[in-house]
Regions:
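NAD(P)+-binding Rossmann beta1-loop-alpha1 motif at the extreme N-terminus of oxidoreductases
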Residues: 1-56, 152
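Short, well-ordered alpha-helix to beta-strand connector turns
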Residues: 17, 57-58, 84, 128, ...
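Rossmann-fold NAD(P) dinucleotide-binding segment
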Residues: 51-112
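Rossmann-fold dinucleotide-binding core
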Residues: 93-170
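Short, intrinsically disordered, charge-balanced linker/junction segments flanking boundaries
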Residues: 168-178
Length: 178
């Protein structure tokens, strides 16, 4: 997605000279696409025609979409993902959705990694604390950190990173409510 999270990551990666492409459902509607085109033009981001086109040309796909779109986007990306390319799933989807997305991506030759964003992105931007999970997480963490991310390995098991995030959220929100 090329919403708030996607645009922030694109800005920070482009500031380092990293080539960035993006795709978003909103690109299908001229009215909602205009601000995305404006931002992409200012940042030097290439807008892809589809999620599959984006995946076909990428070594790393960061999926930051709504929970309802997590599996459909993973399926679209899996249809064209490069062998060995990473698919980093930032989505707040259910464990079952994460497992379905992982099966699609890994089954197509990609490397699915669960990414749990541990706090709000805007104040931290690319340095937001991330917990990674999955069998390819240990290989992706140093690559992300070299790009400026603050990524740490949680577990090779899918779901541990997201469960840790959920537990943290329950505690923090509970304390804030007191």
């Amino acid at each position: 997605g090329y919403g708030e999270v996607g645009r922030i990551l694109a800005e920070d990666l482009r500031a380092q000279g990293v080539a960035v492409a993006a795709w978003d459902l909103k690109l299908a509607s001229p009215a909602s696409a205009a601000p995305l085109h404006d931002h992409a033009g200012r940042q030097g981001v290439v807008l892809a025609a589809s999620a599959a086109d984006l995946a076909a040309g990428s070594d790393l796909v960061v999926s930051a979409v709504t929970a309802s779109q997590a599996v459909p986007v993973a399926a679209d990306c899996a249809s064209a993902i490069r062998p060995g390319a990473f698919f980093l799933d930032f989505n707040s989807a259910s464990p079952g959705a994460k497992q379905r997305a992982a099966a699609l991506v890994d089954g197509a030759g990609g490397r699915y990694v669960e990414g749990a964003v541990m706090t709000s992105i805007p104040p931290y931007r690319i340095r937001v604390p991330l917990l990674l999970g999955g069998s390819s997480a240990a290989r992706l963490a140093p690559l992300l950190n070299a790009l400026g991310f603050d990524a740490k390995m949680a577990s090779e098991r899918l779901g541990v990173a997201s469960a840790t995030k959920m537990c943290r959220s329950v505690i923090i929100k509970g304390l804030e409510a007191m």
